[in-house]
Amino acid sequence: DNDTLYITADTLKSISKPRQKANNNPEDSTKLIVTPAPPTLPDTIRTFYAYRNTRILKSDMQAVCDSLTYASSDSIFKMFGTPVLWSDSTQFTADTIYLHTKNNKITQVALLQNAFVANKVQQGIYNQIKGKFVDGYFTNGQIKTVHVRNNAESIYFMQDENKAFSGMNQSRSAAIR
């Protein structure tokens, strides 16, 4: 999948450095010699920084934040400064957002401090979850499971088999799964 990711910001910075690999010294087993690995593509750690007015655009998600970092070693986008992430019809906000990816697809989103998730059911109706921390897990680009920790609250609109709204569930707990 050659889906392109676009990132804009006032300042962009990219750093590449070779991974370090350890070699044991056969003459002295108490010594560990660390030498730089040759700078081949798979052995290079790439770190990317975006500062001020950062925007991300991809076919399956968009995001805005003040700044972000990304490291190829763990494939996590770390967004800071009032980050907002949109994926499909779901909006995620928190003080900090960690977006985990694998093979260019979102696998997990971690919302740290003041986490809030809103999912549009139809015009003017949103299922909502909030808490101190929220972890969302994705399958095939769609959010499938959400775990809320510390001061968890949710509002969920129930629908019958004909998609007619049949009620609203409001919950509060220490955690919601």
Residue ranges and their predicted role:
Residues 1-177:
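Structural signature for solvent-exposed beta-strand/loop edge elements and short helix-capping sites
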